[in-house]
Amino acid sequence: MALTSAASTDAPPTTGFWALTLGGVGVVFGDIGTSPLYAFREAVHVAAEGAQVTRVIVLGVLSLILWSLFIVVTAKYVLLLLRADNNGEGGTLSLMALGQRAIGRRSVFLMSLGVIGASMFIGDSMITPAISVLSAVEGLKIAAPALEHYVVPLTVGILVVLFAFQRWGTARVASAFGPVMIVWFSTLAVMGLIHINDDPSVLAAINPWHAVHFMLSHGMVGLVTIGAVFLAVTGGEALYADLGHFGRKPIQTGWLFFVLPSLLINYFGQGALVLSHPEAVENTFYRMVPESFLVPLIVLATAATVIASQAVITGAFSLISQAVQLGLLPRFEVRYTSETHAGQIYLPRVNMLLLIGVLMLVLLFRNSSGLASAYGIAVSTTMVADGVMGFVVIWKLWGWRPAAAAALIFPFVAVDAIFFSANLLKLLEGAWVPLLFGLLMATLIWVWRRGSAMLILKTRRTEVPLNDLIQSLEKRPPHIVKGTAVFLTSDPEYVPTALLHNLKHNKVLHEHNVILTIQTAQTPRVDPAERVTMENISDKFSKVRLRFGYMESPNVPKALVIARKLGWQFDIMSTSFFVSRRSLKPAAQSGLPRWQNHLFIALSRSANDATDYFQIPTGRVVEVGTQVTI
């Protein structure tokens, strides 16, 4: 039979270019924009090894920072990967989906890269709030040394308030993020310009030879220093992840003409300060201003780090939501904090887990220098994964020859690999923490995927083909009742469990029965014209398929209204939704190792109710329970 579809009249809102650029400055660059608080200081400390800071060290570190920002952030992300958008969206999972779409099938290799990159992003989303807020509050030690003991408690208090605030969303205060960060970056530039005059010869670091000379003359210390230099580019991957929110041009404009110059000027100002006043290396950032300006700068830095942390938290919510839609994780409870912005979501469980992880990091390391050792490994792993997946997109989707695609992307991957190796050297000093968080996340995804596949295989053995049931009901029709019954199922070729139970226990059949399947596309959003597909298979049965993008919130009743254009007189008040709820029990002989079996069952039990997740009115739902051993 012919398949039909209908379109919706909904249209995405449009925002002015400069408004998007301002918004991007407030959200996209928060993480990388707060790196001057600690990046240069930590790199110089590592390079000096406790000895006197020399001119070679300062110029070498500055040159490494400059060219890292040029190569990794500007060339790789801003100029190249921002063009690899998946229907306007960016980020690790979007790149994974784009690569799979490009090769025309699901790839275990690409899936693994996407999972690794996403898992490491979650690890990074715990470290960023901790190190950012802690480094800002540490300015109190300079303003008032007697307050040093209050740095950690104050940091904990700020973070608890920040995470507690998530339940109300950020829509009301987000408009202030842009102006605050404009002030922040402008302040960075002014501070840098003032101190470059202390020793203008610091500008010689623009010559990449100083980076090469430093590496050649410092051996293994140089490689360890690269791990600290990487702190200056952490957050670069966020430029790509936020592509869908602000667009390529606004992000490129904000970076190239405002954020990058401000960062470089500040770093060079810190370098000039250390060359003229070596004692300032203790905390180069806060030593750039006189004591009378310390408190206002601490307040501004704290505001900037809170905004940066907010962007990372929001990114974590978005990534987990995408992972759920792609079937990588169970359905977590999602609350919508804005009636006008679909992307404003709050995941209570994820928020609590992030808060616990962040507080553990603050209490474990207690200062930003300690956390700096843990920072970087997660981001560098994500960047390597992005680079390899980018090669697939350039080759398969853009149509480049493999050699040309490799020549373009693998120099960036090589640089990312060097940063990754350098960060591995900090494994025992703290880099194990984000790796542990990432490993735990990847394990959850792996077990959920494996358990779900095994559950499908097990239930398939007892399922009845839908066409066989329809033929049987036509020969021996049961009692027919008025109304419409919608049966949710993952496979429309087989009879939903709820339908079998309805026939077995109630011995009735509705006059209209809809076998409803909800699919997630490999695109962030689905064109409304392709949202609903309907197929009539008999007088009493029809199949309806709803397609949602992996960044969309599946709203079943709203989508079914579109079916009216296909001839189905859908009325929510005369429709009953039948949902099957599985109760999983461990089998005596499971196909999974014992620990995986119990973990999968625990994940399944923690999943949000399908009724709530698909936004179906609870008063119209009939839930049928079944017990399955796995």
Curated annotation (Swiss-Prot):
GO cellular component terms given for this protein: plasma membrane
Cellular location(s): Cell inner membrane
Substrates-to-products reaction catalysed: K(+)(in) + H(+)(in) = K(+)(out) + H(+)(out)
Molecular function terms, GO-annotated: potassium ion transmembrane transporter activity; symporter activity
Record field: transmembrane: 17-37, 56-76, 108-128, 145-165, 176-196, 214-234, 255-275, 293-313, 345-365, 375-395, 402-422, 427-447
Membrane disposition: Multi-pass membrane protein
Entry-linked Pfam families: K_trans, K_trans_C
InterPro entries: K+_transporter, K_trans_C, K_trans_N, Kup
Keyword terms of this UniProt record: Cell inner membrane, Cell membrane, Ion transport, Membrane, Potassium, Potassium transport, Symport, Transmembrane, Transmembrane helix, Transport
Record family assignment: Belongs to the HAK/KUP transporter (TC 2.A.72) family.
PANTHER family documented for this protein: LOW AFFINITY POTASSIUM TRANSPORT SYSTEM PROTEIN KUP (PTHR30540:SF79), OSMOTIC STRESS POTASSIUM TRANSPORTER (PTHR30540)
Functional description taken from the UniProt entry: Transport of potassium into the cell. Likely operates as a K(+):H(+) symporter.
Protein name, UniProt field: Probable potassium transport system protein Kup 2
